[in-house]
């Protein structure tokens, strides 16, 4: 199960803990780009010990050794190399045939095209124009060798749903989501290309009220989404989460 330590990932972790009586039976995967916020790494180390997580940390060391980074490359290239390729490497190394992900349809128009069970080919690519229909609880879950399926239980949750669940269950999350000095992060990614929003929302109640009044995109602060037309769709077609 990919785990970014963001709010959606932590909700999915919490649901897994509840489903399996406090012990997640499958490994969690953190794709470490080496550009993580220090607060996220601190949270990762705390949560791994606190919940007894079997954590796999994957870095695309080959790309980093070639100098791939935000200092020298555009954000779409870096995202593909350090996130998508690293994910493909992890899937191949561990021979996984399924991933449980925390993506949601309301995050981005491209994710709105997704399915609860989303097949990926042997290159982890997503053929969004040729997805199998999913009617009356019938899901496509059989894979050919080398392929995998992405299981996406939060697909129909909204951003406010996520926050209300965090509030109800008192789920620990990184403090970067809460306002400090008039700014907070609404969505978390690599620190060089993730920008905070103007906000005074310092509590979950404040955040929910803020979201109920806003019309701006949740991922407006994520630079790779806006680098070129249809950037997110191109990234996801190649295997990005």
PLM ranges: what are they?
Residues 1-2, 7-241:
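Nucleotide-activated chemistry modules centered on ATP-dependent adenylation/adenylyltransferase
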């Amino acid at each position: 199960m990919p785990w970014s330590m963001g709010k959606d990932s932590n909700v999915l972790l919490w649901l897994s803990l509840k489903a399996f009586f406090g012990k997640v039976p499958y490994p969690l995967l953190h794709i470490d780009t080496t550009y993580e916020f220090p607060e996220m790494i601190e949270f990762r180390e705390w949560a791994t010990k606190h919940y007894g997580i079997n954590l796999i940390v994957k870095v695309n060391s080959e790309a980093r050794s070639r100098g791939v980074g935000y200092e020298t490359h555009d954000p779409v290239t870096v995202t593909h190399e350090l996130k998508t390729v690293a994910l493909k490497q992890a899937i191949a190394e561990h021979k996984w045939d399924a991933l449980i992900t925390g993506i949601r349809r309301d995050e981005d128009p491209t994710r709105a095209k997704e399915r609860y069970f989303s097949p990926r080919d042997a290159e982890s690519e997503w053929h969004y124009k040729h997805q199998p229909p999913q009617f009356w609880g019938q899901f496509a879950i059989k894979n050919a060798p080398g392929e995998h399926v992405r299981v996406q239980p939060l697909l129909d949750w909204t951003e406010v749903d996520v926050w209300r669940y965090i509030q109800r269950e008192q789920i620990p999350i990184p403090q970067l989501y809460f306002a400090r000095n008039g700014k907070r992060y609404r969505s978390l990614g690599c620190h060089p290309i993730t920008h905070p929003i103007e906000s005074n929302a310092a509590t979950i109640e404040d955040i929910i009220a803020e979201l109920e009044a806003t019309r701006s995109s949740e991922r407006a602060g994520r630079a790779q989404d806006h680098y070129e037309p249809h950037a997110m769709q191109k990234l996801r077609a190649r295997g990005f989460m």
